[in-house]
């Protein structure tokens, strides 16, 4: 049996093997042409449209980022402007309130001075009237004293 296996192995090694891994015959150029044709067809049908779509996508993303950046910049500028306007409005409102308080205080002061002046005038008039009434009362009293003294004199002398 060993002899049979050895003879079989010798027959196998003596026969010529065709179609190996690196066989250089007419199929090699045909395979190269098929590979080139497949590459060209795939390039035309698949890779160029895919590349175009990817380029459009990149352009869209770049445009979107640019637009978003511009919108953000504009929003920041508007925010700053509105904050400045708000601060200015608050300052104006505080100035208006301060002026209104000063005006109110001036009005109150003038009203107090006017009331004080009126009160002083009233006091002066009242004092003058009281002095006039006092003088009249004293004159009446003097008249009555004269009348009474005359009556007392008449009664004392006439009796």
Curated annotation (Swiss-Prot):
NCBIfam families listed in its UniProt record: ATP_synt_b, PRK07353.1
Compartments, record wording: Plastid, Chloroplast thylakoid membrane
A Pfam family the protein falls into: ATP-synt_B
Function noted in UniProt: F(1)F(0) ATP synthase produces ATP from ADP in the presence of a proton or sodium gradient. F-type ATPases consist of two structural domains, F(1) containing the extramembraneous catalytic core and F(0) containing the membrane proton channel, linked together by a central stalk and a peripheral stalk. During catalysis, ATP synthesis in the catalytic domain of F(1) is coupled via a rotary mechanism of the central stalk subunits to proton translocation. Component of the F(0) channel, it forms part of the peripheral stalk, linking F(1) to F(0). The b'-subunit is a diverged and duplicated form of b found in plants and photosynthetic bacteria.
Keywords, alphabetical: ATP synthesis, CF(0), Chloroplast, Hydrogen ion transport, Ion transport, Membrane, Plastid, Thylakoid, Transmembrane, Transmembrane helix, Transport
Gene3D superfamilies linked: 6.10.250.1580
Homology family: Belongs to the ATPase B chain family.
Gene that this polypeptide is encoded by: atpF2
Gene Ontology CC annotation, any one: proton-transporting ATP synthase complex
SUPFAM superfamilies for this protein: F1F0 ATP synthase subunit B, membrane domain
Main location: plastid
Note: In plastids the F-type ATPase is also known as CF(1)CF(0).
Protein name listed in UniProt: ATP synthase subunit b', chloroplastic
Regions crossing the membrane: 30-47
GO molecular function: proton-transporting ATP synthase activity, rotational mechanism; proton-transporting ATPase activity, rotational mechanism
Membrane topology of the entry: Single-pass membrane protein
Subunit: F-type ATPases have 2 components, F(1) - the catalytic core - and F(0) - the membrane proton channel. F(1) has five subunits: alpha(3), beta(3), gamma(1), delta(1), epsilon(1). F(0) has four main subunits: a(1), b(1), b'(1) and c(10-14). The alpha and beta chains form an alternating ring which encloses part of the gamma chain. F(1) is attached to F(0) by a central stalk formed by the gamma and epsilon chains, while a peripheral stalk is formed by the delta, b and b' chains.
